[in-house]
Curated annotation (Swiss-Prot):
HAMAP family: Ribosomal_bL19 (MF_00402). InterPro entries: Ribosomal_bL19, Ribosomal_bL19_CS, Ribosomal_bL19_sf, Translation_prot_SH3-like_sf. One of its GO terms (molecular function) is structural constituent of ribosome. It comes from the Bacteria. This is Large ribosomal subunit protein bL19. GO terms for cellular component: cytosolic large ribosomal subunit. This protein is located at the 30S-50S ribosomal subunit interface and may play a role in the structure and function of the aminoacyl-tRNA binding site. It comes from Rhodococcus erythropolis (strain PR4 / NBRC 100887). Transmembrane segments: none annotated. NCBIfam families: rplS_bact (TIGR01024). The keyword Ribosomal protein applies. Belongs to the bacterial ribosomal protein bL19 family. GO terms for biological process: translation. The gene is rplS.
């Protein structure tokens, strides 16, 4: 193991649940406004997960007031308060970019049994 891997291993979080593209998550993000800190919930479907180690990121997509919103989070970021897996999705792709073009019921992902 080289020096960078050793440094990366110290800053990895161990409280991250197992999740994959297609899963629906509640991502609790710490937001600092002035002197106050609060937790903001971002609920959506994971459309991709990429990278490894400290640089690993995932993108969550939701539709808010008819507008698609995507947000990319670093997995091991200290600004993430917690991640909750709500449902497991049954998909056959690693990157779900095709959901950007789908509307209504077609954009729904089957739940894994």
């Amino acid at each position: 193991m080289n020096t960078l891997d050793f440094l990366d291993k110290k800053s990895l979080r161990d409280d991250i649940p197992e999740f994959r593209p297609g899963d629906t998550l509640n991502v609790n993000v710490k937001v600092i406004e002035g002197s106050k800190e609060r937790v903001q919930v971002f609920k959506g479907v994971v459309i991709r997960r990429q990278g490894g180690g400290v640089r690993e990121t995932f993108t969550v997509r939701k539709v808010s007031f008819g507008v698609g919103v995507e947000r990319t989070f670093p997995v091991h970021s200290p600004t993430l308060a917690s991640i909750e897996v709500l449902t497991r999705g049954d998909v056959r792709r690693a990157k779900l970019y095709y959901l950007r073009e789908l509307r209504g019921k077609k954009a729904k992902i089957k739940e894994k049994r």
